[in-house]
Swiss-Prot record:
Reported cofactor(s): [4Fe-4S] cluster
Reactions catalysed according to its record: [[Fe-S] cluster scaffold protein carrying a second [4Fe-4S](2+) cluster] + N(6)-octanoyl-L-lysyl-[protein] + 2 oxidized [2Fe-2S]-[ferredoxin] + 2 S-adenosyl-L-methionine + 4 H(+) = [[Fe-S] cluster scaffold protein] + N(6)-[(R)-dihydrolipoyl]-L-lysyl-[protein] + 4 Fe(3+) + 2 hydrogen sulfide + 2 5'-deoxyadenosine + 2 L-methionine + 2 reduced [2Fe-2S]-[ferredoxin]
HAMAP family in the record: Lipoyl_synth
Gene: lipA
Pfam families, per database record: Radical_SAM (PF04055)
CDD domains for the chain: Radical_SAM (cd01335)
GO cellular component annotations of the record: cytoplasm
Enzyme category, top tier: transferase
Residues binding [4Fe-4S] cluster 2, per UniProt: C87, C91, C94
This protein's name: Lipoyl synthase
């Protein structure tokens, strides 16, 4: 279980997810020495949190209980989660709450743009909850947010981490037309684990979505990630790599799954740093331009630095 101690806020911890309350506790093995969580105590963390709250924004850093929040917020790096804090799905790994979301805030794109300006972000990551209740899955809102940031901060590069827009015809085209710099959509786990880990999604739909992004705009960088430690086998991880490369995905992230609460999916195994290194080496050999694989790797961790490396890798390949 990941425990983050917020020494800045006195806000009580949110109760356990009501939709998971009837589940038996899932016990995970003790965390090994290589799993370390930095407590968020710095001035930079406090300043970032103030800007987020002043603009009435939600971050995936907080909602998902990200273990890297102390490091990232100290550097004034935050990943904004648009369209509310309530998801229409109930994935077994995710700490974001589930329920019926409220109406979209039409001012949210402007608030995100203003927070981006105040934080001085050179690279912005925008993600969202799943909004299966909306006709377009929130695609137009994503596009509006990208455009608002472009107008307010024209030099800021933009990375988006989207839901799968399952059964939302035309939604992907709307988002791609807004021209983010990086389009990220995470597979989260191997196909055999979808029923227990990500039951509301479809593995090959996600692969096709990433492939379609490249068809719509070959200049966009595409990115995807998975968690390990959920019961997958090594050969399954390698097959995911092959599937992503068949969709011409540029950037792969692999990180250790950490259990948010005992009502979430248990950690089946802690993958060693050496194994992560092996995955990275294999992924590069399969043709990915950029790979980040480590116990604490998360989609948005070091996203700005990684984007610079990704762009340099493409430029080197074109020479």
């Amino acid at each position: 279980m990941v425990v983050l101690v917020d020494t800045v806020s006195s806000t009580p911890v949110r109760p356990r997810h009501p939709e998971k309350a009837a589940r038996p506790d899932a016990l995970s093995p003790k965390k090994p020495d290589w799993i370390r969580v930095r407590a968020p105590t710095t001035r930079g963390y406090g300043e970032t949190r103030s800007i987020v709250k002043e603009n009435g924004l939600v971050t995936v850093c907080e909602e998902a209980g990200c273990p890297n929040i102390g490091e990232c917020w100290d550097k004034k790096h935050a990943t904004f989660m648009i369209m509310g804090d309530t998801c229409t799905r109930a994935c077994a790994f995710c700490n974001v709450k589930t329920g019926m979301p409220g109406a979209l805030d039409p001012n949210e794109p402007a608030y995100v743009a203003e927070a981006t300006r105040k934080l001085g972000l050179e690279h912005l990551v925008i993600t969202s909850v799943d909004r299966d209740d909306l006709a377009d899955g929130g695609a137009a809102h994503f596009a509006a947010t990208i455009r608002a940031v472009r107008e307010a901060c024209p030099t800021t590069t933009i990375e988006i981490l989207t839901p799968d827009f399952l059964r939302k015809d035309g939604a992907l085209e709307v988002v791609v037309a807004a021209k983010p710099d990086v389009f990220n959509h995470n597979l989260e786990t191997v196909p055999s684990r979808y029923l227990s880990v990500r039951p509301g999604a479809r593995y090959f739909h996600s692969i096709r979505l990433l492939q379609r992004v490249k068809e719509l705009d070959p200049t966009l960088f595409t990115k995807s990630g998975i968690m390990v430690g959920l019961g997958e086998e090594r050969h399954e991880v390698l097959q995911v790599m092959d599937d992503l490369r068949s969709a011409e995905v540029d950037f792969l992230t692999i990180g250790q799954y950490l259990q948010p609460t005992r009502k979430h999916h248990a950690v089946m195994r802690y993958v060693t740093p050496d194994e992560f290194g092996g995955y990275a080496k294999t992924a590069y050999a399969k043709g990915f331009l950029m790979v980040s694989a480590s116990p604490m790797t998360r989609s948005s961790h070091h996203a700005g630095d990684d984007f610079a490396k990704l762009r340099a890798a493409r430029a080197a390949l074109a020479r």
